[in-house]
Each structure stands twice: as structure tokens, then as C-alpha cells.
A protein has these predicted regions:
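Short, cationic low-complexity segments
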Residues: 310-333
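Short glycine-/small-residue motifs
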Residues: 159
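Intrinsically disordered, low-structural-confidence terminal and linker regions
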Residues: 2-8, 12-16, 20-52, 56-57
């Protein structure tokens, strides 16, 4: 799920570049439309493999950009091959986490309401299963984890994790008004399709109270990836604000599998594509299709943090990262 009702002029309006005339070259928006046009086929295949349909769709949107050339999209055969490859990976996760995986996909016996939900902490092992199996990034993010459970069955309805604030470029902007030590990142939010309406807003209210009470948190950030078709509607409903756009988005792959910047820095010491290509050779690939900037959203949890929110969103350039960097960094996409 993704999600600013704000009296400021700060909004989610597209940039001049995003409003430009369509390019003759394949665009990410065209790729999103292509995947949506095949949604019935994708969802049907997911049901046959007993994997989550939405996870398969978003994983395809992460993997297909590596097959886009300067002139054209992947052909029908390539798309089908990618559907099978991503499905194989997701099926591995299903088998790894049985029976919890299959049980999580089952519709509840009766529709749930917000009153059926109970907020509380989630242990690391359980969070890892949901991060790896159902969140579009597909990898575990360490931190503090919280969930809504059905009071009657104990089933997890949604979860979200918070991690330490590690955005050096954003810290420079907020430091005059907010102590960076009082800032957290909201990461890996996920809700099942059968979750009640407005689950994110309800979850955020509970999480906000928890973080203020436990950590005296004053400001929270979260990233949204519009290249997956996310429009931040849930965040808008929960009063998040567009703090910045981060240009330079690109996807990196190892042996055909999408991997995060965090993965490459942890395992190979850098996120610099040229250095990784030299180290890893043909097994390493980078998407060439132009991707929209990532959206960095923010929400003040206490009144004093409102001054840190810009009237006009900042524009950042995505940094190259290395393991020895002493600067705070963002490694999650």
C-alpha cells in the first residue's frame, strides 16, 4: 500500500520533466501500462503457483526494466520467461515459509473491520518472513517491527517497520529545526488485500503514539517508488507530505535478480555501477530505461517538527554509496 493532505503548496504534482511530451523511446509509464494490461494473465499464473498476485506484479515491474532496450520493450517470449523466473523465486519463498505463507493468503471467514484489529510489536523472524515474501522489495530490513493482528484469529493483517534515520542529504535540510536522532524511517509497510479500508491510516495513528511514547520521535520519513505504479494514496490519507524527489533512480541486478543498494554495499562494498560491473562482469546489469525520481515523504509527529517541512519539495540526487562511507546513507531501493 502506498499514501498528503496539507495546507501547504507542497503536493505530489508531477515535475515539468514528467509533464513533457511522450518520448519516442519506451517509458516506464508505458511499461506499467503493459503489465497492467496483462494483469489477468499474471494473477491467474500466481494463483496456479499459489503465490501472492500483487507481489508477482510488483516484482515483474522491478525485473522487466532490465530487458527494455533503447528502442523497444521485451517481446512476448521474454515477458513470459520473466513471469516464470520471478514466479520460481516467489515459490521458493512460499516453500521456505510454509505453512505460514499459504495461511496468510487465505481470505478471512468474514470481512474484518478496523475494530477487529489489535496493534502490537512483531518479532524479527516473523517480520523477516513477511518482508521477504510479500513486500515488493523482497528483502529483510532490520529495525523495530509492528503489526495489526485480527483479535479473534491472531492473523497478521498488516505490518510496518521503523529503522534508524540514515539519509545524510536529508539530514542537512532538517538539522536546523529537528535533532536527527529524533527521526525514524518507516519501511516495509505491507497490508493484505483483504485488510479493512483505511488500514494504513489506522496503523499510522497507532504507530505514531507508540514512537512518541517510546522514543520521543519528532519526524518520520518514508520512500515511495512511483515506477511501480504507486501513487501514495494511503500516505496522502494519513497526512504525509512530499519532502523531496530523489533523481537518479535505477535498478541493479545480479544473475537476473533485482537487488537493493543495501545488498550491493553489504556484499561488494559499493553501489557504484561501474565498480560493480568491473567486479561482477556479465552477471551484473543495470536498467537503462529512464525511471521517475523516488518520492521521499515526511510527516511531523510533533508540532515543533513542522518547520522542517519545505513549502516546495527538495530535489536530491541519488548518492553512490560505499561500505566505508562515514556519511549517513539510504540503502533501501
Amino acid at each position: 500500500m502506498d499514501a498528503v493532505v496539507s495546507c501547504q503548496s507542497n503536493s505530489f504534482q508531477p515535475t515539468d520533466q514528467e509533464l513533457a511530451e511522450p518520448s519516442i523511446h519506451p517509458s516506464i509509464d508505458d511499461l506499467i501500462a503493459l503489465v497492467r494490461a496483462q494483469e489477468d494473465r499474471i494473477f491467474s499464473h500466481a494463483r496456479e503457483r499459489a503465490i501472492d498476485p500483487l507481489t508477482l506484479r510488483t516484482q515483474l515491474l522491478l525485473h522487466l526494466p532490465r530487458l527494455v532496450t533503447a528502442d523497444d520493450f521485451p517481446d512476448e517470449r521474454d515477458i513470459q520467461r520473466e513471469i516464470l523466473a520471478v514466479s520460481d523465486f516467489l515459490e521458493e519463498r512460499r516453500l521456505k515459509y510454509q505453512p505460514e505463507y499459504t495461511q496468510s493468503l487465505k481470505q478471512p471467514e468474514r470481512p474484518l473491520s478496523l475494530g477487529d484489529l489489535e496493534f502490537g510489536p512483531l518479532d524479527e523472524n516473523t517480520a523477516k518472513m513477511y518482508h521477504e515474501s510479500f513486500h515488493y522489495v523482497g528483502s529483510y530490513r532490520p529495525g523495530r517491527h509492528f503489526a495489526f493482528r485480527d483479535k479473534n484469529s491472531g492473523r497478521i493483517v498488516c505490518l510496518g517497520s521503523v529503522a534508524s534515520f540514515d539519509l545524510g542529504h536529508a539530514e542537512e535540510k532538517i538539522a536546523p529545526d529537528v535533532d536527527p536522532r529524533s527521526v525514524l524511517m518507516l519501511s516495509r509497510f505491507f497490508a493484505f488485500r483483504w485488510a479493512p479500508e483505511n488500514t494504513f491510516s489506522h496503523f499510522h495513528r497507532k504507530l505514531r503514539l507508540q514512537l512518541i511514547e517510546e522514543f520521543d520521535t519528532k519526524l518520520m520519513f518514508s520512500f515511495i517508488n512511483p515506477n511501480l505504479g504507486f501513487n501514495a494514496s494511503s500516505h496522502k490519507g494519513a497526512h504525509w507530505t512530499l519532502f523531496a524527489r530523489e533523481a537518479g533512480t535505477r535498478y541493479m541486478y545480479l544473475d537476473g535478480r533485482y537487488r537493493t543498494m543495501r545488498f550491493f554495499v553489504k556484499n561488494y562494498g559499493t553501489s557504484d555501477a561501474a565498480k560493480l560491473k568491473k567486479k561482477l562482469g556479465r552477471s551484473f546489469e543495470v536498467s537503462t530505461i529512464d525511471l521517475h525520481p523516488m518520492w521521499l515523504l515526511a510527516i511531523p509527529l510533533q508540532r515543533r517538527a513542522r518547520k522542517a517541512i519545505p513549502t516546495i519539495p527538495y530535489l536530491f540526487q541519488r548518492p553512490e554509496l560505499c561500505a566505508s562511507s562515514s556519511a549517513k546513507i539510504f540503502l533501501d531501493c
